[in-house]
Amino acid sequence: MLFRSNESFARVAVAAFITHLNPTLEELADIKTAVSEAVTNAIIHGYENLSGYSRHGESIPAYSIVHPGKVRMHCVLEGDMLSIEITDQGKGIEDLKKAMEPLFTTKPELERSGMGFAFMEAFMDDLEVESTPGKGTRVHMWKKMRCGDWIGKED
């Protein structure tokens, strides 16, 4: 599926971004897991804004390759704080409080667990989600990095 390759690319990109910080394996796994959840959700729901197409009388899933939406990831390191922002131009989230409840999913047919936001909260130090129905969603995550021995850090 399309979102698998994009989700994998995002995980590799964020790993490359933090490599010079010499992260622990736990930090690296935590960040990659949180990014994976955020990007997968953005791709699945980001494409939904482009629904309404059909082929042979059968509805085409909005997350399909036919009309992809944009998903952006922005990473910044300020001091020892890593900031990662994932945005989409999807349909947005009608009930954000409900969507952030563990096990809540709007995509049971995709075998989604409904644990995306719970994983993001568990693996990152802080999480902020903003969403506007019809416009899209912004997920902003922060993690304090153990930056004592950066690779290439000047003494």
Which residues does each PLM region occupy?
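Conserved beta-strand-loop-beta-strand hairpin that lines the nucleotide-binding pocket
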Residues: 42-155
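Conserved strand-to-helix beginnings and helix N-cap segments that scaffold or border functional pockets
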Residues: 11-12, 97
